[in-house]
Amino acid sequence: MARLRPRQRKEPALGWAGLGGLLLLLLAIASGGALAYFYFSTPARPVLDAQTLCPVNGPQGITVVLVDTSDDLPETTQREILGQLDDMITTLPPFYRLDIRVLDIAGVRSRSLFSKCNPGDGEGLSEWTDNPRIARLRWIEDFRKPAALAMKSSIAAAKANSSPIMAAIQDIAIDQFSSAAGKDAKKTLYVISDMIEHTRNYSQYARAGDLSFQRYKQSPAYLKFRTDLHGATVIIRYVTRQVNGQPLLDGTKHVEFWKDWIEDNRGIFGGAKRLQGA
């Protein structure tokens, strides 16, 4: 009599539920991989100082704006200056420091009205790894608004009998361009002024002498205000002073003097542009 073979047990079929679970598992793995890719491939944002908003290891760039109001500025000129300053605020790269300064006549130096880094406005941040909305709010409240307020204050009239532009630039070079943190940073200085240096050590008014750099080198101001701009680019926004409709100084020779002065102090002359209305 033939022996009965035991019936083979069939493995349970995967079924739709099992297939769905497998797909969900694969989707989770893929999503996790994508998130990890974004997290590790996105450049890490630097740690910022709570007060200055600059990276704790120093700003990536430094932009200083020196506004000279030792003489009144025409309304048209003021409007153009405000427009240019607003452009600087809104286009400053992230993690660059913006320092807005005016002449400190009494102290024979400069005075800072605002000095902070752009912390970034949230543009380009990932929703996965950052919070663009909070970054935007911080940029507005901690950077944009106070910088705009300082910008308006910088053009307030402060008429004076002297104009220590060289001393102010020397002060800026010591404060902003000489530190180890600023050594490798891109450095730019904008000077908004008629550029007429007038102190007891040296004056550029016609009654004091010509605009030659040689005359300046023979004055006490040459050694007193000699400085190191550490390769900073200096850009002049030139205000033309007039008497009876005629320029007070020869603008071409005047700008040439300042080009020589900047280069003699280890800076880069970035050009001069005449402002409207003056």
How would you label these PLM feature ranges?
Residues Q8-V64, S70-T77, T90:
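Acidic, polar low-complexity linker/tail segments
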Residues H230-A278:
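Extracytoplasmic/luminal low-complexity segments enriched in Pro/Gly and acidic/polar residues
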Residues V67-T69, I172, K186-H198:
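DG-centered beta-turn motif at the end of beta-strands
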